[in-house]
Amino acid sequence: MEMTVTRADVQKILGDELEALRSRIIANHVAAKQVASGRTKDSIKVELTENGGILWGRFPFGTLETGRRAGRTPHNFTGIIRQWVIDKGISVPPIQYIREPSERWKPKYTPKERGLMSMAGAIAHKIKTEGTKLYREGGRNDIYSPEVEKTVNSITDRVGLLFEQEVEHINLNTKNEDGHNK
């Protein structure tokens, strides 16, 4: 019975472990109620390469545990926050106009849109000047950090066991100078 550890064996272990890691990270992300649009969750992908594997996620993936620090924001940040408010289903009180519509003036936005833009602007300003609430509170370490460590340990154990079995097999098949098994 020929027993040889192949690259395919190692790739299978790696693929299985990375897929399990992906699932656990998504479950932690959902349990922490961080999902709004689902784009970050949907962006987490496993890619196996010739020499290893990669777990990919969109750019803000790292902020799931750290939050976003204050500072420069992307173009149209208020619009991004506006969409986040909508995706999260946050209720926003409308802001009524004081001025009455007339022939010379028609409101550009509905009261509901005004309330949404006002809230999005306030949130965007707070993040730009102070960072997200998660960042201000020191972050967390339960979304992906412990899961990555578990996965690395599991891969190490499983691949190590494969090679340990291979070495035992080699030892069993070695012969001494007389041609007899040792």
Q: In which residue ranges do the predicted regions lie?
A:
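Charged, low-complexity interaction tracts
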Residues: 39-182
